[in-house]
Curated annotation (Swiss-Prot):
Taxonomic lineage from the root: Bacteria, Bacillati, Bacillota, Clostridia, Eubacteriales
UniProt record similarity statement: Belongs to the UMP kinase family.
A Pfam family reported for this protein in Swiss-Prot or TrEMBL: AA_kinase
EC number: 2.7.4.22
Name of this chain's protein: Uridylate kinase
Name of the coding gene: pyrH
InterPro entries tied to this protein: AceGlu_kinase-like_sf, Asp/Glu/Uridylate_kinase, Uridylate_kinase, Uridylate_kinase_bac
């Protein structure tokens, strides 16, 4: 097998991706598929960090839109990401993989607090390190958390797991004629509002030169393909 193109990655998993075909909760088949794929990547001596969202359980923006205090709604969303992180940790450990969950909000009974140097040490020891609770601050998305953690741990790429095989100029589910992009630069993403990630996250990636690969999570084996440098999905960079 060819050598991996990237040696340290951040995999961004949305809560919706963990829900699979459901609208709420966690799909065990999806969870186990992700775990198998991550183990496959780690066996190639790639260091894997994962940032999880919480939209399958609670979305802070949705709560705010219904009149809830935005900060409170966002903190609830951060707690939802911890639930997802623990579920993913369990799935990975059932595959025999060493893991650590690190939360931006301290809850020492269930996971470690996020400490940058400790996170890097876990990665160097071959442990899959799962970052939960976003940035720990309201008003920031888990996409921004993925960009921030990538910069902090000096990850070489962010793999954005989606339910579609890349970035399109329109929703491919609603518009079969939507055009798929194989490659974009950060300015395209920011100026055209293509939905890769929010503008704060995209700007952070641009400022720190962190490339993004948007790919289809539903096809098993795609995480490894992206790590090996195969042309899948959409590449966003300079």
């Amino acid at each position: 097998m060819q050598k991996p193109k990237y040696k340290r990655i951040v995999l961004k998993l949305s809560g919706e991706a963990l829900a699979g075909h459901n609208t709420y909760g966690i799909d065990n088949e999806v969870l186990n598929s992700i775990a198998r794929q991550v183990v496959e990547v780690v066996r190639q001596e790639v260091q894997v960090a994962i940032v999880v969202g919480g939209g399958n359980i609670w979305r802070g923006v949705a709560g705010s839109a219904k009149g809830m205090d935005r900060a409170t709604a966002d903190y609830m969303g951060m707690l939802a990401t911890v639930i997802n992180a623990l579920a993913l940790q369990d799935a990975l450990e059932q595959e025999g993989m060493g893991t650590r969950v690190m939360s931006a909000i301290e809850m020492k009974e269930v996971c470690e607090p996020y400490i940058r140097r400790r996170a890097i040490r876990h990665l160097e020891k071959g442990r899959v390190t799962i970052f939960a609770a976003g940035t720990g601050n309201p008003y920031f998305s888990t996409d921004t958390a993925a960009a921030l953690r990538s910069a902090e741990i000096e990850a070489e790429v962010i793999l954005m797991a989606k339910k579609v095989d890349g970035v399109y100029d329109a929703d491919p589910v609603k518009n079969p004629a939507a055009l798929k992009f194989d490659r974009l630069n950060y300015i395209d993403v920011l100026s055209r509002g293509l939905g890769v990630m929010d503008s704060t996250a995209a700007s952070l990636c641009m400022d720190n030169g962190i490339p993004i690969i948007v790919f289809d999570l539903t096809r098993e084996g795609n995480i490894l393909k992206a790590v090996l440098g195969e042309e899948i999905g959409t590449y966003v960079g300079r």
